[in-house]
């Protein structure tokens, strides 16, 4: 078994509740078929408003109109401000994940956050979490977003650890695929407790009491 020297956590959907759940609630509340918004975001691609928001090229305020236009092109009417309010309301931290992060650091391993995020009125939705991590890499700050391989290389450089010695937790398959291709061990977070059990097995010590 390889020796893991650092663990990298996604934020939304891993350390915090998933923004995808908030988007699904918005769709239910507004009579949209499931996954409609995500399909529009994916179809808009790297030139779309969502990708530009996560690279820090737009703030939330300047993102709303082009995002609504992207959705409209794909036949979806979305109130961008209301959707972002749903996402903001869902940004609650998962206490078990924070406790696991503390335990990992107490064992002498380095811990990083690697998040696709954005800036809203000068604030970032992750501002309250930074003290829990040795390294905090944000897409809106570095101008790269997952699954661009360069952002994984960046977090490994910041940690001072080779990718082959890093474990990465994320809730989105394409983000994990890019990390695996660089040699990282990956864990998909669908059930947080199960993910922590898998990470415990990888590290060789318990993260859940």
Regions found by a protein language model. Name each.
Residues 2-99, 106-107, 118:
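N-terminal helical cap/lid subdomain that shapes the substrate entry/recognition surface
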Residues 110-112:
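Structured, non-catalytic alpha/beta "coupling" segments that mediate domain-domain communication
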Residues 107-108, 132:
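Structured helix-beta-strand junction loops
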Residues 1-5, 9, 102, 114, ...:
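Asp-based, Mg2+/Mn2+-dependent phosphohydrolase catalytic module
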């Amino acid at each position: 078994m390889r020796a893991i020297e650092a663990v990298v956590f996604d934020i939304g959907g891993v350390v915090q509740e998933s923004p995808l759940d908030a988007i699904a609630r918005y769709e239910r509340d507004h009579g949209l078929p499931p996954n409609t918004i995500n399909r529009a975001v994916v179809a808009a691609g790297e030139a779309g408003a969502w990708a530009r928001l996560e690279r820090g090229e737009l703030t939330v305020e300047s993102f709303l109109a082009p995002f609504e236009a992207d959705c409209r092109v794909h036949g979806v009417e979305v109130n961008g401000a209301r959707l972002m309010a749903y996402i903001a309301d869902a940004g609650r931290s998962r206490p078990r994940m924070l406790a696991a992060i503390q335990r990992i650091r107490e064992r002498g391993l380095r811990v990083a956050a690697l998040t696709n995020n954005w800036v809203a009125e000068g604030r970032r939705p992750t501002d309250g979490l930074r003290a829990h991590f040795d390294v905090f890499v944000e897409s809106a700050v570095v101008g790269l977003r997952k699954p661009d391989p360069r952002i994984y290389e960046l977090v490994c450089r910041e940690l001072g650890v080779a990718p082959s010695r890093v474990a990465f937790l994320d809730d989105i398959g394409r983000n994990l695929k890019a990390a695996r291709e660089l040699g990282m061990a990956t864990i998909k977070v669908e059930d947080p407790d199960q993910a922590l059990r898998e990470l415990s097995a990888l590290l060789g010590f318990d993260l859940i009491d």
